[in-house]
């Protein structure tokens, strides 16, 4: 694992969580989702080239990914259903629940279905789809010449631009969680190792002693795109996917090309605290809604009874400050008591 890629992944997870609890200034956090899929495709392409694809290898790869995705989803869903039942807000729609349990809800274009129950679980459904497609893509796509890969991406990108043009918020959100749309992010990530190999042959790229300059350029490009997103309503139809492709691709490439020679930004992203949070990243992302419920229904009332209101502070307004440490604590507990024991049981052989 490239530490800086993990660090950026955690950084975006934390910002997404803050956006979900009401920080509207972070409404561009779709860039984080784009990064997740691109970095996943990139790392898989580095580790699993699948030059020789056979049924046994595919089944082993797919089964391992299925076992990593479904148990955490079912565990989180059970927690959510239990909490909703205790609060008296539980409403069961059998079809919707069935689609959610099987992670097929992301294929629906209906808002109440793809955002049902644990709202972020659509991400797992799309990620699993990308995982299941990966061996086939790796076998047929990765061996292509770079120019042929870029032609494929250009065609897919043009299709995405045309499809998204003129979309309203409802239809754009449906496409935002639709697996084939996110597969483009994933495929871009799969292409980047080839781009990096070519970049390394150039006289300038990747040759400096450390990556400070390259990191600053990548962050500047990403920041400029964020500012364009906020100030130019004309880009809104493509604000969930297309406009982030180049900035995030550049960021991932810099992380890879300067792995082991990080500048100050890279060293921050590779720092031990972020890497430690990276060990519970999946749990943190999935449990963010549970953490919000725990705070709003348990901790905030307790803080109110302890006299926080007399200090002029509304306990409920502190959720954006408390969600991160509480979420990390819950993620660590679930990782220690559920994920790790289950992984030892499933993957010990």
Pin down the residues of each PLM region.
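Hydrophobic alpha-helical segments with transmembrane-like composition
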Residues: 105-162, 177-179, 183, 193, ...
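Aromatic-anchored segments of alpha-helical transmembrane domains
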Residues: 13-21, 102-107, 154-167, 219-231, ...
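Interfacial loop-to-helix transition and helix-capping segments at the boundaries
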Residues: 2-3, 23-33, 112-126, 166-188, ...
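Membrane-interface junctions at the ends of membrane-embedded or membrane-associated helices
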Residues: 1, 49-56, 60, 139-147, ...
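Alpha-helical transmembrane segments of multi-pass integral membrane proteins
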Residues: 186, 217-340
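Transmembrane alpha-helical segments and their boundary/interface "anchor" motifs
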Residues: 5, 49-85, 91-103, 125-130, ...
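Generic alpha-helical transmembrane segments of integral inner-membrane proteins
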Residues: 14, 39, 74, 78-82, ...
């Amino acid at each position: 694992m490239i530490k800086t890629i993990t660090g950026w992944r955690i950084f975006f997870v934390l910002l997404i969580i803050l956006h979900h609890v009401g920080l509207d200034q972070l409404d561009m956090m779709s860039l984080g989702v784009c990064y997740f899929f691109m970095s996943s495709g990139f790392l898989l392409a580095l580790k699993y080239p699948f030059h020789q694809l056979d049924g046994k290898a595919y089944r082993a790869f797919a089964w391992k990914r299925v076992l990593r995705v479904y148990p955490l989803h079912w565990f989180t869903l059970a927690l959510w259903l239990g909490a909703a039942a205790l609060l008296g807000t539980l409403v069961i729609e059998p079809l919707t629940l069935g689609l959610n349990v099987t992670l097929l809800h992301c294929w629906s274009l209906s808002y109440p279905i793809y955002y049902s129950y644990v709202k972020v679980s659509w991400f797992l459904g799309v990620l699993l789809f990308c995982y299941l497609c990966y061996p086939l893509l790796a076998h047929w796509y990765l061996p292509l010449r770079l120019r042929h890969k870029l032609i494929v991406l250009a065609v897919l990108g043009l299709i995405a631009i045309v499809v998204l043009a003129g979309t309203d918020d409802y239809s754009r959100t449906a496409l935002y969680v639709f697996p084939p749309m996110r597969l483009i992010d994933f495929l871009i990530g799969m292409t980047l190792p080839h781009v990096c190999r070519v970049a390394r042959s150039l006289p300038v790229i990747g040759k400096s002693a450390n990556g400070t300059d390259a990191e600053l350029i990548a962050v500047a490009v990403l920041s400029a795109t964020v500012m364009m997103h906020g100030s130019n309503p004309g880009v809104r139809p493509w604000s969930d996917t297309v406009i982030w492709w180049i900035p995030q691709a550049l960021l991932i490439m810099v992380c890879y090309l300067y792995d082991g020679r990080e500048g100050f930004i890279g060293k921050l992203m590779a720092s031990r605290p972020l890497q430690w949070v990276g060990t519970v990243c999946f749990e943190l992302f999935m449990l963010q809604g549970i953490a919000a419920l725990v705070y709003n229904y348990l901790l905030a009332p307790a803080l109110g009874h302890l006299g926080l209101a007399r200090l002029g502070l509304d306990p409920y307004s502190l959720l954006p400050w408390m969600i991160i440490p509480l979420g990390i604590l819950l993620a660590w507990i679930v990782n220690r008591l559920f994920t790790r024991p289950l992984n030892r049981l499933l993957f010990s052989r």
